[in-house]
A protein has these predicted regions:
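Adenine nucleotide-associated cytosolic modules
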Residues: 1-253
């Protein structure tokens, strides 16, 4: 770190639990963020401002006027533009010293597998179960830590799945791919704007702790937030030994 960086990140360096070594690890790290919507907006901006050295943002959508209520990484003049490019422009303005790659695509399973391989931490900020499960499978295969978030109406959740740790669960252990989950979308059910900011910020927090090597992460815990009542709930997670993605069923296959 040079003197200018020490000044930029000085409030991190003042933290005994963080300090220069952790900041150096953060500056050397690569985060893959899938989704530049409500969750991704908050996560991306805090990753950039905190000094995540390299950020790859993947999103195949374009900015719509209805997005601006909660997707704060985009601006009014971004309407109609690719979300990945719009987000990258904002991040570059926040922190020009980091490397930002914008991928304007809907990454399928094979593409996600390749992208995950090159990352140190993966943030799932997507809005559908098919993508979430594809990201999870890639993270399990590559043994990369996954920070998963979701938010709809007034309810949000965040969890960390880190199979580098013995006994850790994966996303499929919690939400089986064939469990007939309903696809709940903001377009039909609505979403409270600050909710996705809260969850996305927590995703950034967990990702930073993972790559910087500080504190205890949410691995093994699911945090649920009820924004209407401002209540938090914690659910303990355990690996499903018969999980088709990370358990015995996968090994048998």
């Amino acid at each position: 770190m040079d003197d200018r960086q020490r000044l930029r990140y000085s409030r991190h360096l003042l933290l005994n639990e963080f300090g220069e070594d952790a900041q150096e690890r953060l500056l050397a790290a690569h985060a893959l963020v899938v989704g530049a919507g409500g969750l991704g907006s908050a996560a991306l901006m805090y990753l950039a401002s905190s000094g995540m050295g390299r950020i790859t943002v993947v999103d195949g959508d374009r900015v719509d006027l209805t997005n601006l209520q909660r997707q704060v990484v985009h601006r009014s003049d971004s309407v109609g533009k690719p979300k990945a490019a719009s987000a990258a422009a904002t991040l570059a303005a926040i922190n020009p010293d980091i490397r930002i790659e914008a991928l304007e695509e809907r990454a399928g399973p094979e593409r996600l597998m390749a992208l995950v391989q090159g990352a140190d931490v993966v943030l799932d900020c997507s809005d559908n179960f098919a993508t979430r499960h594809a990201i999870n499978r890639a993270c399990v295969a590559a043994r990369k830590p996954l920070v998963s978030g979701a938010g709809i109406r007034f309810d949000g959740q965040v969890a960390v799945f880190d199979l580098r740790r013995e006994g850790s669960a994966c996303y499929h252990c919690l939400f089986a791919e064939d469990s007939r989950e309903s696809e709940e979308r903001c377009a039909t059910l609505g979403v409270f704007a600050p909710l996705v900011g809260v969850i996305g910020t927590l995703q950034a927090l967990e990702a930073i702790k993972l790559v910087a090597g500080v504190g205890e992460t949410l691995d093994g815990r699911l945090m649920l937030f009820e924004a209407l009542d401002s209540r938090w709930h914690e659910v303990r997670l355990a690996r499903d030994p018969e999980c088709r993605v990370c358990g015995a069923a996968r090994r048998a296959a």
